[in-house]
Amino acid sequence: MLLEVKDLKVEFPTRQGLVKAVNGVTFSVDSGETVAIVGESGSGKSVTSLAVMRLLQSPGRVSGGSITFDGADILALSENEMESVRGAKISMIFQEPMTSLNPVYRVGDQIVEAIQTHTDLKYKEAMERAVEMLRVVGIPSPEDRANDYPHQMSGGMRQRVMIAMALSCNPKLLIADEPTTALDVTIQAQILDLIYNLREKFNMGVMLITHDLGVVSEVADRVVVMYCGQVVETARVDQLFERPLHPYTLGLLQSIPRLEDDDSKRLYMIRGSVPNPLHLPAGCPFSDRCDSCFERCRREVPELRPVPGSPDRTCRCFLVEEGSDDDR
């Protein structure tokens, strides 16, 4: 297994109390596989990715669990050892490329800096590699565009530059945090196709952070659904779309607009909002928003358990435990 996260806990001490942003998250990513981490804002998915990269900002801290990458305990590495992993073996691309690129440096030089940080290449050789990576990600006239500043490029081109930078040192794992949110639909499709094709070409694992299940259906192999810092369901992508088990997953799927729906049909909306992490419900965190909630849900916190008859998927719901998911 390339990446294995077990019972990960991340906390943020605040004046109001302790925020458990990630609370016992477990999942894995293998080489050549795309695992999508899905959830609303505040679900803990981005904090999970930052924990894997060891980029948590103070006062955030990992308070429990383990992160194993390619056989190494990420949490036990020194900062110098982690710097040799970050950017070289694990790379990350972010939601808004304009804020990730330095506006006063040419994009080619920014890729060169990433390459020289992790290799012994001289500037000329590193620039040749940077130009080649720009070509790989589909930027036309890469020799010329390497001399451009970020503001001279469109949003889609800037995201391609970020992908070129992330892949310049041949990482084994790519973490993509909402890589298409700031782009229009046509460019979104191009970037997703690019990530998929590069995954196939380099046999790298991809950890895709997103709230968009439409994106998930296009590129993911497996899905991890998060809510309030916990994993509530894991499944192969075909299983999840064919038969979602957790009411939250079902709500996310039902809220996707479909072309075949009647214009007069009201779009489904999950009622309420994500609860304050300082004041979670006593039982299941989703109980106040769940249409299938019953008394046990308000008293007890369900555990993430294997689904009977489907050993490769899990669900955190009493309905599934009791065999009452009603074949949804």
Residue ranges and their predicted role:
Residues 2, 11-24, 55-61, 78-81, ...:
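A short, flexible loop at the N-terminus of ABC-type nucleotide-binding domains that lies
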Residues 54, 175-179, 183, 187-265:
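P-loop NTP-binding/switch modules centered on Walker-like glycine-rich loops
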Residues 62-73:
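Conserved ABC transporter NBD signature motif
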Residues 74-91, 109, 117, 239-244, ...:
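ABC ATPase NBD coupling module
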Residues 120, 124-139, 146-147, 242, ...:
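ABC ATPase nucleotide-binding domain helical subdomain, centered on the C-loop/LSGGQ "ABC signature"
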Residues 140-144, 234-328:
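Short catalytic/signature loops enriched in Gly
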Residues 168-172:
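A short, proline-enriched helix->beta-strand linker immediately N-terminal to the Walker B motif
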